[in-house]
Amino acid sequence: MLKINTNDLPELTWSSPKGKFAGSGKQVSEALGRKPLSTDLKERHPFDIEICRIPAGKTPYPYHSHSAQWEFYHVISGKGLVRHKDGTTPIEAGDAFLFPPDEPHQLINPDSESAQDLILYVVADNPIGESGYYPDSKKWIVRSPERRLLRCEPLDYFDGEE
């Protein structure tokens, strides 16, 4: 049995170029042997686990949905908001919620006054062939080691074929 202590894991921090999006995470699945960014089924787990930290006044990523991936969240500490297709919902320590495929969502820590981080467990089922859609910017991401982003234009099915 492989055992780790999440207190010993490094916290990887990210930020968008202009700083609107920021967060950090402890990659629990990778510490338990999952190969980062691998698409090989023998190097993946059936789910990914992350401990996500969202600083006060930030959101870790844009509003998005997944084509095939389910995501489960459990709030460890702090308070925040979840933006979803029906509006926003307040969240706090102890809350758990789930997003199925094709349901857009975004976590937000609006609490810039108390400067308290929002910390959550995130469990995703890690499907093969996953892609994501960003409704606000109308772009797609194709799940691959290169994390390619695309914007689509309406085309006829036979465009470029004849």
Each predicted region: which residue ranges?
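Short beta-strand segments
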Residues: 61, 87-89, 132
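A short, N-terminal "cap"/entry segment at the start of jelly-roll beta-barrel domains
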Residues: 1-46, 134-162
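Short acidic-glycine-tyrosine-enriched beta hairpin
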Residues: 86-102
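Histidine-centered metal-chelating micro-motifs
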Residues: 59-60, 81, 97, 102-106
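Short histidine-centered beta-strand/loop micro-motifs
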Residues: 38-43, 61-66, 108-110
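Conserved short histidine dyad/triad with adjacent acidic residue
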Residues: 32-36, 50-66, 101
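Short, conserved beta-strand element in jelly-roll/cupin
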Residues: 46, 51-55, 65-84, 124
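Ligand-binding loop in jelly-roll beta-barrel domains
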Residues: 101-130
